């Protein structure tokens, strides 16, 4: 079930909120758990056992870690069981066929692909990391063991963040999970509705609209009747315009989903962590990764980078740790060599900044932002090079070897205003405008009402538009 659909907006969400608010305090987590299962199983019921297995593995290992509090060996074995079980399922469903096909390509073997796993269980990359963060934190004694399986299940499958984040650690919500009375206040619900509306507007008014520019250039894989330019016919300037449009679409799509999730979490009484902080205003790649998908970066930093030694064991070890994290980041995004190359691409950039570039970037004012945006857009070109209808080699030849073809003037006329608005919405200027409007209760309410009404009109009139990060 997608947030930006009629069935979610006008049926599931209001019914779920009504049941949740009307439920007795002690039953709120049960209602949340059951409604979240309905949300997940709506389109992915065949993968429900996978999620249930992950919940049970980490729940039981958590209990075992408490049971063997003084037995270091037993605790380590239980942690390894949780890691092997959780990561093993993620590997099987997401990476097994990729590994087999890669072995076939490299060694000329004839391993047949595993049948039945061509479709990835929805959200598995996200909820696997959430369950693992709980077990690791219990092992490290950073959080107490959760004894109530319904409460633990509600944490794992909580529908606002289940499918595409933000990645919520157990300690982020554990206190609120055990507050049964006065979990939320009217102000929280109001703030949550505001955040949800902004997220919905980001998705349907900006992401989907600007994504149409990229579609006009590259085409739609499942709609051959739709007219488009085609990558082979596009000029170099038009291809750059298309990749910039894709970069904007990806940001508004993912940050919009995250904002909707954070808003719904607030309506339920939970404070989810921020996931984006205007990444396109960054003045370095290092800063970009502090602002983009912050919960994923934070997860890798806490559970991989720091345990490997972090910044404590000299520059060479820092570079190695960075290599591991960026490689895993690329692998996490998808079972494809494009994503692995994308992760290694960012490793090289981050390593160069750590070695010598960062001091120079901090001294600059304009050029560091141009440098960062250029490299980020090139990175997204590697990202989209995996999509249907995009030939990776042709895309990069078009980007870096000047070629003729259809020019961008027509598209600039059609999308110029939208591009300008999108660029402004990538900066803190939009937040300053909102603070100005929200000083007055009437203008605040009218702004939200207009955004919600227009967004709903677009939802009603549009076809299905899934979130891009559902693929990961």
Predicted segments with their positions:
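Membrane-embedded transmembrane alpha-helical bundles that form the catalytic cores
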Residues: 1-471
